[in-house]
Amino acid sequence: MWGACKVKVHDSLATISITLRRYLRLGATMAKSKFEYVRDFEADDTCLAHCWVVVRLDGRNFHRFAEKHNFAKPNDSRALQLMTKCAQTVMEELEDIVIAYGQSDEYSFVFKRKTNWFKRRASKFMTHVASQFASSYVFYWRDYFEDQPLLYPPGFDGRVVVYPSNQTLKDYLSWRQADCHINNLYNTVFWALIQQSGLTPVQAQGRLQGTLAADKNEILFSEFNINYNNELPMYRKGTVLIWQKVDEVMTKEIKLPTEMEGKKMAVTRTRTKPVPLHCDIIGDAFWKEHPEILDEDS
């Protein structure tokens, strides 16, 4: 009797197994419809292996955006701090980013050489970074512009470039910081001529046409008593974001076995987070101080 039951159970399981396999095969066949051929038109945008992947974002038409939202000239610390907050959010979301650099309305994000995020597809790198950054800009706006409502959503365009060596990556970041210095020096003199000397924008532009860096420094010092080297490093050098260990103090409720109610106590914990620095990255000192950034296994 028991033997007969075992045979029936075994036969039933075998029947169920055969039926299940048929349904799975049918599902797989249905999933591959006649329309699936359109996937063949997708371009292969895989980034080269063993190269640094850099995503650079730029604000779209930010001159108009800055005017509409009453940004301070030549620099608005609120706007720069908001940009950095957005960049930190991107780095915390995409942890394969080893360093970021930002100035004015742009930010560059460097993914480690061995990253395999998004199967190294350039379109995925660019769209994930751009969407996370833009949504963060809107989300955190009120934290930095309490009295200025956001009149319309900002836009950011992005591009992806791969750099084959440590030196080319360092040269890229040096280029962006040099660009920060050139633009900020010009803007500092330009707006001093307008705000303090009463020149029109056209007149200020004409005054600065053909001048060198030394000439601009001389105008600032002799006419406005401004030593450019004393301007905030955030304005002159931009912002570098790197991962560092930071001690954070938080309040936690601790309940001892002998007590009925818990007590709130300050607890210090250490975590790694993107930390902003305003320092020179063109020279070798920064890279010697932070060798882990270019480490293959960082």
UniProtKB/Swiss-Prot annotation:
Mutagenesis / variant outcome for changing D58A: Reduces activity by 99.5%
| GO BP: any one term | tRNA processing
Q: Which tissues and organs express this gene's product? A: Expressed in many tissues.
Q: Which domain of life is it from?
A: Eukaryota
Q: What is the effect of changing K216A?
A: Reduces activity by 98.5%
What GO molecular function terms would the record report?
Answer: ATP binding; GTP binding; guanyl-nucleotide exchange factor activity; identical protein binding; magnesium ion binding; nucleotidyltransferase activity; tRNA binding; tRNA guanylyltransferase activity
Record carries keyword tRNA processing: yes
Q: Where in the cell is it found?
A: Cytoplasm; Mitochondrion outer membrane
Q: What does this protein's record comment on cofactor binding?
A: Binds 2 magnesium ions per subunit.
Q: Which residues form a coiled coil?
A: none
**Top-level class of the enzyme under EC nomenclature:** transferase
Q: Please name the Pfam families in this protein's record.
A: Thg1 (PF04446), Thg1C (PF14413)
- Keyword hit for Magnesium: yes
The entry's cellular-component GO terms read:
cytosol; mitochondrial outer membrane; mitochondrion; transferase complex
Give the residues the record marks as binding Mg(2+) 2: D58, D105
| Subunit architecture | Homotetramer. Interacts with MFN1 and MFN2; functions as a guanyl-nucleotide exchange factor/GEF for MFN2 and also probably MFN1.
What task does this protein carry out?
Answer: Adds a GMP to the 5'-end of tRNA(His) after transcription and RNase P cleavage. This step is essential for proper recognition of the tRNA and for the fidelity of protein synthesis. Also functions as a guanyl-nucleotide exchange factor/GEF for the MFN1 and MFN2 mitofusins thereby regulating mitochondrial fusion. By regulating both mitochondrial dynamics and bioenergetic function, it contributes to cell survival following oxidative stress.
Disease tied to this entry: Spinocerebellar ataxia, autosomal recessive, 28: A form of spinocerebellar ataxia, a clinically and genetically heterogeneous group of cerebellar disorders due to degeneration of the cerebellum with variable involvement of the brainstem and spinal cord. SCAR28 patients manifest mild motor developmental delay, gait ataxia, and dysarthria. Some patients show mildly impaired intellectual development. Disease onset is in early childhood.
Q: Which family does it belong to?
A: Belongs to the tRNA(His) guanylyltransferase family.
**Protein name per Swiss-Prot or TrEMBL:** Probable tRNA(His) guanylyltransferase
State the species of origin: Homo sapiens (Human)
